[in-house]
């Protein structure tokens, strides 16, 4: 799940871009591999996922798939859930790919009822290509058959076969539907509590955590 992605339906050859970082694309350039018009697949880790989306778009990719490689979070590092804490093959990391803070539709002004809002294509920091997280079980089905350019040794992950950069012969179709247009904008509420100090009543210690949640439960949001 990648929050702030756009809707899209694209089909293209797949290129493996390691972690999808600036230096990884520089390495691809040195190998003579272009991702323009391709679907790129990148490992999670070593940078914020929004940077991966930004760099994929900047280099001309039409979609980005991200997965947790078992070398970083999976059976290579220990027992997978439920026997252990590591990610199983179908486990998908969720999170935002927004490169910014606050409401991207109201950058620099309050996101209140009746506020002027930017259209999706005008929001700063929002990727304009479909971005989707997948499990390493699904990623293996793509990576196993990618051929083309040999990878630098440091790009080898933990799946039980030799990785290649591509492009081809593997193709994929990425379909993402963003239902914000049909669900609309909903209000959220903040909860504020004050414990007045006795020794330094005029000084403030501010402790906060986001109240909104990915789903049921309070582990992520209430814990900070």
Short names for language-model regions:
Residues 1-123, 130, 216-223:
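Extracellular/luminal Protease-associated
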């Amino acid at each position: 799940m990648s929050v702030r992605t756009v809707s899209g339906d694209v089909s293209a050859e797949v290129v493996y871009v390691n972690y999808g970082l600036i230096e990884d694309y520089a390495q691809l350039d040195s190998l003579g591999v272009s991702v323009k018009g391709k679907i790129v697949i990148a490992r999670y880790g070593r940078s914020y996922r929004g940077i991966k989306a930004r760099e994929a778009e900047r280099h001309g990719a039409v979609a980005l798939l991200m997965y947790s490689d078992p070398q970083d979070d999976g059976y290579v590092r220990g027992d997978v859930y439920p026997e252990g804490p590591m990610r199983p093959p179908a486990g998908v990391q969720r999170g935002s790919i927004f490169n910014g803070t606050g409401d991207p539709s109201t950058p620099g002004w309050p996101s209140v009822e009746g506020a002027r809002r930017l259209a999706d294509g005008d929001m700063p920091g929002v990727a304009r290509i479909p971005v989707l997280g997948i499990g390493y079980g699904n990623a293996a089905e793509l990576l196993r058959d990618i051929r083309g350019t040999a990878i630098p040794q440091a790009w080898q992950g933990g799946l039980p076969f030799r990785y290649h950069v591509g492009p081809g012969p593997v193709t994929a179709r990425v379909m993402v539907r963003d239902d914000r247009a049909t669900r609309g904008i909903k209000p959220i509420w903040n909860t504020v509590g004050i414990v007045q100090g006795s020794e330094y009543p005029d000084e403030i210690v501010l402790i906060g955590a986001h109240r909104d949640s990915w789903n049921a439960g309070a582990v992520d949001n209430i814990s900070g």
